[in-house]
Amino acid sequence: MRMKKKRHGAERMYLLSSLVCNDAVNLVENREEIFKNSYPLRIEIGCGKGDFIKEKSKADKDYNYLAIEKIADVCVVAVEKYAQSRGLGCLAPNGGWKKSDSTIVPLGSSPVDFSGDDLGNVRFAVGDAAEMLSKLPDSSIDAIFINFCDPWDKKGYEKRRLTYISFLELYSRILSKKGKIYFKTDNRGLFDFSLEQFEKSPFKIVYSTYDLHSSDMNKTNIETEYERNFTEKGFKINMLIAENNK
């Protein structure tokens, strides 16, 4: 389903530029300056509206995160949601940004000045994840999260799947040794396909289940907005964790 275009989406994203870093290489190379710490960097491919990354970054505070989303009108929702969760303000009625001190920064203004505020351990990027990741240095990432990606069900589209062997080889290169991939999907066909691809790859599957919400792993599971909706409709969630053995 195509998402309705967000009113003033580009302008809203621009106001929160402090939380956006579309140059993933710069983020990796200057992570200590950007995050003000030396914690390992993790990546979420396809962050959607940001429920997962918002909660994951709270649960695992000793990591930094880059949340990548291809669709700008989806990513702006995630950025705003995260900013509000950090106490940095909220969306103003006119589409501008209302800071925590109640100052209104209207649309068309320069980016919101968050100097002195703690921006937390997440930055966002809009663009094609594969293109961004292909430019990253070897062994520069601690973990990758792939939640409910497009299954590309049509015949002949297998190579577009984010768990196709060529993607797994890319992930292996940029992940540290023993770095992990966390993969969730409601699509059984995609999951079985992914299990086969991982077996051909440098990764070792250390955990898998066809019913995440009935497993012990559910105790620490953080739901995405998509996952919550489809679980309520009776869909079972498949999950695997794979470790990089390059």
Report the location of each language-model feature.
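S-adenosyl-L-methionine
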Residues: 1-43, 51-60
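SAM cofactor-binding core of SAM-dependent methyltransferases
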Residues: 40-85, 119-130
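Intrinsic disorder/low-complexity segments
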Residues: 86-117
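A short acidic, Gly/Pro-enriched loop at the edge of an enzyme's catalytic core
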Residues: 134-143
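A short SAM/SAH-binding and catalytic strip from SAM-dependent methyltransferases
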Residues: 142-161
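A short glycine-rich, Lys/Arg-flanked "PGG" loop and its adjoining helix->strand segment in the class I
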Residues: 163-177
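Conserved beta-strand signature within the Rossmann-like core of class I S-adenosyl-L-methionine
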Residues: 178-185
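Class I S-adenosyl-L-methionine
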Residues: 191-196, 201-246
